[in-house]
């Protein structure tokens, strides 16, 4: 595993002090590296990580296997429900039914000491209720690590709510098996993008210095303009590129739509 940067080290030290930790982490900051790094440094600590989808689950499992980390089990909300509560199906409907019937676990819950919930900005009230039931049924004190990014909420249409991240302490503190105080931490250092990309995102999309990059990269040229004049702006930029030696094959246009009012893009 890579050595921790100062942000990751701070989270590690908070966890060593037995705090429950809430982490606001921008894209590419190494959340998985942080969790697995902690697991590697604390091999006797049994960890359960719950994340939103199968792809994220597989990524953590593959990284754990690659680094011979054996003290972490990884589930999605659905696979966790299936293992302990659902006799058939992986659907929200089945989870809702299990909660309504207050199903008891079908088998003893595998021991863990730390619960990691990732991508919490995508948590729905249903998944929150599932985790409350699961923690209550487990019935032993645990430590929590909550990870997410309020700017990456993708599933509002499914009922997700970023307040499960932004208000996490108030939401989780009432549970009797979370006895330690909550502390907040942030991760801003992204390994996924270059410094010019980070500058572009901060200035044009976020309006704040939220992302920090470590990789150098080519300068990013960008134009901020009213969308009502976008066709003329794009035509000007294309003509300028062609006049400066670029060929048509060097130019790629990405638009929200190329139909209807935006058909000028095709011209």
Task: Indicate where each model-derived feature is located.
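Conserved RecA-like ASCE ATPase "motif II neighborhood" in helicase/translocase motors
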Residues: 83-119, 123-134
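Short, flexible coil/linker elements and helix-boundary hinge sites characteristic
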Residues: 68, 85, 89, 102-103, ...
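Inter-Walker segment of RecA-like/P-loop motor cores
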Residues: 51-100
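Short hydrophobic "helix-edge" motifs at membrane interfaces and signal-peptide entry regions
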Residues: 43, 66-68, 108
